[in-house]
Amino acid sequence: MVMIWFDMDGTIANLYGVDNWLPMLREYNPAPYAEAEVMLNMSLLARYLNKLQTVGYGIGIISWLSKNSTTEYDEAVTAAKLGWLNQHLKSVDFDKIHIVDYGTPKTSFRETDEDILFDDEERNREEWGDDSYLPNDIIEQLKNLLKDAE
């Protein structure tokens, strides 16, 4: 099954728009992950993702934990990220969710050569190669996938 993977921070969740996000993370405060605003119309995104699942695509998350971390903080960040997904994409039944150590190559979760990645980080897109896109391309690319599947 071809997977459509999403990064969270800076891609669908505006972590970097939260006031004082970096000092908070350095103090092991997971609040910015929970408080991040959405970066696109989530009801539209959810509709596209659900339609794509019905035509055979898998939907997944690959998101990094905080750069500075402890086991307890990693657990709190994971809970905050899962809570954010549940709040903003409640109707999406994700096939896979990987919340992993900061810097883990996202390519290690690629399942097929056709897998797609949406990520704001240039290095991740470069490592992924073809079928990697910026956050502002999400809706247009999902529309194209649906059109091609029909």
Predicted regions and their residues:
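Lumenal/extracellular "mature" regions of secretory-pathway glycan-modifying transferases
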Residues: A76-A79, V92-I99
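Conserved beta-strand termini and adjacent loop/short-helix elements that scaffold enzyme active sites
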Residues: I62, I99-Y102, P135-N136
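Acidic, Mg2+-coordinating phosphoryl-transfer loop and its flanking beta/alpha structural elements
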Residues: T112-E150
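A structural signal for isolated positions on well-ordered beta-strands in alpha/beta enzyme cores
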Residues: G58-G60, H98, I116
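Alpha-helical substrate-recognition element adjacent to the catalytic core
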Residues: W5, D9-W84, H88
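Structural motif
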Residues: M3-I4, I116
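Donor nucleotide-activated moiety binding/catalytic core segment of transferases
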Residues: D95-E114
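Structural alpha-beta junctions
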Residues: T54-G56, N86-K96, D130-P135
